[in-house]
Regions:
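Extracellular/periplasmic carbohydrate-active domains that bind, remodel
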Residues: 1-199
Length: 199
């Protein structure tokens, strides 16, 4: 995946994900001047021990570097986790559009974060069934911990975000009776203080 993004930044070609699920086991850096889209909402999933430490969170996708200007367009994707990854920041957004020439050219359109509740996440009703009669502890919730954060927009960054949503599953989508489930996620979206406009 990293080589594909690096190549696209040089060639100007659009990165196109065929429909399917793609596992990411360490940070992928998205350079500026990349356009990314998918067929029928392919799924990009953070998984593995690299993302296991909630005291040392790491991004799955790191878009640009802090203070970097450029264009990145992401559309028609779903971001998930496979298994508990309490140290995963699903997207770290570092890039800022050069608003003098290309206002709102760094952004995410029609892409969504969905944590648990669906096939392949390993965070479903067979593991994380809601049980209101049981006291939950950090240890007992370990197998049902989603991510550290869905989206972190860092200082000096900005973006245009349209038709995006984040959902930490409260019920099953793909198994049996679609009962309620308990998934524990650290944060949703943090937009650090910036003097740049975001939309």
């Amino acid at each position: 995946m990293q080589a594909m993004f690096n190549s696209a930044a040089q060639s100007g070609n659009v990165v196109y994900f065929d429909h399917g699920a793609y596992l990411v086991k360490s940070t992928i850096n998205i350079p500026p001047n990349v356009k990314i889209t998918g067929e029928c909402l392919p799924i990009i999933m953070a998984t593995g021990p690299f993302f296991s430490d909630q005291n040392n969170p790491k991004p799955m996708w790191s878009v640009g570097t802090p203070g970097q200007l450029g264009t990145v367009e992401i559309s028609d994707l779903v971001f998930e986790t496979q298994g508990p990854v309490p140290g995963a920041i699903i997207i770290e957004w570092n890039i800022a559009a050069d608003n003098a020439t290309t206002q709102a050219s760094a952004g995410i359109w029609d892409a969504h974060w969905r944590i648990g509740g669906s096939a392949g996440t390993q965070l479903q009703m067979d593991t994380c069934l809601k049980n209101p009669g049981v006291t939950t502890t950090l240890a007992s919730s370990a197998s049902c911990q989603g991510a550290f954060m869905l989206l972190h927009v860092t200082p000096q960054a900005n973006g245009y975000f349209e038709n995006t949503w984040g959902w930490v599953a409260d019920h099953e989508l793909d198994m049996g009776t679609r009962d309620q489930i308990d998934i524990y996620n650290g944060r949703s979206v943090i937009h650090a203080q910036s003097n740049l406009p975001s939309y």
